[in-house]
Amino acid sequence: MKLTCVVIVAVLFLTALADDSRNGLENRNEQERNENEMRDRRDCQDSGVVCGFPKPEPHCCSGWCLFVCA
């Protein structure tokens, strides 16, 4: 009886703390949209421009840097 009560309380507690992921896709799309807007706003280098060490800034617009922006 005590074990049953403990299990019920634990399940209720975990259910109350569970993450609501019903609109997870919507939130993910919103986050990607915000990242794209920030990428457009900041200064970035076009493809073919030297990037990376020893020149860490500015970043490549594509997000890929292999000694030159991809």
From Swiss-Prot:
Signal peptide: 1-18
Subcellular location field: Secreted
Protein keywords: Cleavage on pair of basic residues, Disulfide bond, Knottin, Neurotoxin, Secreted, Signal, Toxin
Protein name: Conotoxin Qc6.2
Tissue spec: Expressed by the venom duct.
Family, similarity comment: Belongs to the conotoxin O1 superfamily.
Disulfide bonds: C44-C61, C51-C65, C60-C69
A GO cellular component annotation in the UniProt record: extracellular region
Free-text note regarding domains: The presence of a 'disulfide through disulfide knot' structurally defines this protein as a knottin. The cysteine framework is VI/VII (C-C-CC-C-C).
Species for this entry: Conus quercinus
Propeptide: 19-40
Any GO molecular function: ion channel inhibitor activity
